[in-house]
């Protein structure tokens, strides 16, 4: 008996924001393009400032520079496709191209989750064990933490992409999204996806809940230690050290958890609009938060511009 032809679909079409009128899409294009350029520029500035200022050659800023690199590639993997789709609705992408986009999206997205965890551990050691900080957070330890984050990101992406694209796609090829994400792609499969969805949920729990728990434990210990500091000024400085990281953590995990840990939604437009926050807005938020809330970064930036650092 001949096998059914499961290779009927050779490319996917993005629904994107085609539901909006042309003039609305044009406004969105301009807004998202500005945010995209600002994201690339601000992350590049963070990297340059850290590279040129030897006072910032510490573990905390090493992690921040790696985070900026990850955010840049993460943005490049998604935003150009979205911007192009705003100008030309019903844009197509080949199945290998879709698999590649999903691979890079997952690699850098998961990498970010564990980088934030490593940064939380760095803050914990700095505040709770300051006398041993230089020993614990040596160059080798920092490289191992970053390498571990990248390896987890790559492994997760390989597993997920292999799982999703082993499914047969027969007739439906319209992705109800503006980029290749797991759930919208699995909806198009002409086979039972129960096991694949369970794998996705299990991985989501591992890469979202586990880092959140580790960061939460770190901050419980950090806050406990800070409250034991005698001087109000000392407590203020300690809290200020963690404020930027904590802001980024809350925003990142709050939005991604809402998308990937909630039950399947029938409102694909709502999911797309929420996805905009972590593919367009959050990558810009990180360098802005670290620049505005971190005195060392602000002073280094002012020195690079030839201006006097803040007193």
Swiss-Prot record:
Q: Name one GO biological process term.
A: detection of chemical stimulus involved in sensory perception of smell
Give the SUPFAM superfamilies listed for this entry.
Family A G protein-coupled receptor-like
Q: Which stretches are Cytoplasmic in the membrane topology?
A: 51-57, 120-149, 224-237, 293-311
Q: Does the keyword Membrane apply?
A: yes
Where this protein primarily resides, as one coarse class?
membrane
Q: Which residues lie on this side of the membrane: Extracellular?
A: 1-29, 79-98, 171-202, 255-272
> Can you list the disulfide-bonded cysteine pairs?
98-180
> In the record, what terms sit under GO molecular function?
G protein-coupled receptor activity; odorant binding; olfactory receptor activity
Q: Could you list the residue ranges that cross the membrane? A: 30-50, 58-78, 99-119, 150-170, 203-223, 238-254, 273-292
Protein topology in the membrane? Multi-pass membrane protein
- What are the record keywords, sorted? Cell membrane, Disulfide bond, G-protein coupled receptor, Membrane, Olfaction, Receptor, Sensory transduction, Transducer, Transmembrane, Transmembrane helix
Q: Which InterPro entries match?
A: GPCR_Rhodpsn, GPCR_Rhodpsn_7TM, Olfact_rcpt
Annotated compartments: Cell membrane
Example of a GO cellular component annotation carried by this entry: membrane
Give the source's domain of life in one word: Eukaryota
Function according to Swiss-Prot or TrEMBL: Odorant receptor.
Protein family membership: Belongs to the G-protein coupled receptor 1 family.
**What is the protein name given in its UniProt record?**
Olfactory receptor 10J4
Organism this protein belongs to: Homo sapiens (Human)
UniProt lists the gene as: OR10J4
């Amino acid at each position: 008996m001949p096998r059914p032809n499961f290779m009927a679909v050779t490319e996917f079409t993005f629904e994107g924001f085609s539901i909006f009128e042309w003039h609305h899409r044009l406004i969105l294009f301009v807004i998202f393009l500005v945010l995209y350029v600002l994201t690339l520029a601000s992350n590049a500035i963070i990297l340059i400032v850290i590279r040129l200022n030897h006072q910032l050659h510490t573990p905390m800023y090493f992690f921040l520079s790696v985070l900026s690199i990850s955010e840049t590639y993460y943005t490049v993997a998604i935003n150009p496709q979205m911007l192009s789709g705003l100008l030309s609705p019903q844009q197509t992408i080949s199945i290998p191209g879709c698999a590649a986009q999903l691979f890079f999206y997952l690699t850098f997205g998961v990498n970010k989750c564990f980088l934030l965890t490593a940064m939380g551990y760095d803050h914990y050691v700095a505040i709770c064990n300051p006398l041993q900080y230089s020993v614990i957070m040596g160059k080798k330890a920092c490289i191992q933490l970053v390498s571990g984050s990248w390896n987890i990101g790559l492994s997760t992406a390989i597993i997920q992409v292999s799982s999703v694209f082993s499914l047969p796609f027969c007739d439906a090829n319209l992705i109800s999204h503006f980029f290749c994400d797991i759930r919208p792609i699995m909806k198009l499969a002409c086979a039972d996806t129960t096991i694949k969805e369970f794998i996705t949920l299990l991985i989501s729990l591992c890469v979202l809940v586990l880092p959140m728990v580790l960061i939460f434990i770190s901050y419980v210990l950090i806050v406990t230690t800070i409250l034991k500091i005698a001087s109000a000024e000392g407590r203020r400085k300690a809290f200020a050290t963690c404020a930027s990281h904590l802001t980024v953590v809350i925003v990142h995990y709050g939005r991604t958890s809402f998308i990937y840990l909630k039950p399947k939604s029938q409102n694909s437009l709502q999911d797309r609009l929420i996805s905009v926050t972590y593919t367009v807005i959050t990558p810009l938020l990180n360098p802005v938060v670290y620049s505005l809330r971190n005195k060392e970064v602000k002073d280094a930036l002012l020195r690079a511009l030839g201006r006097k650092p803040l007193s």
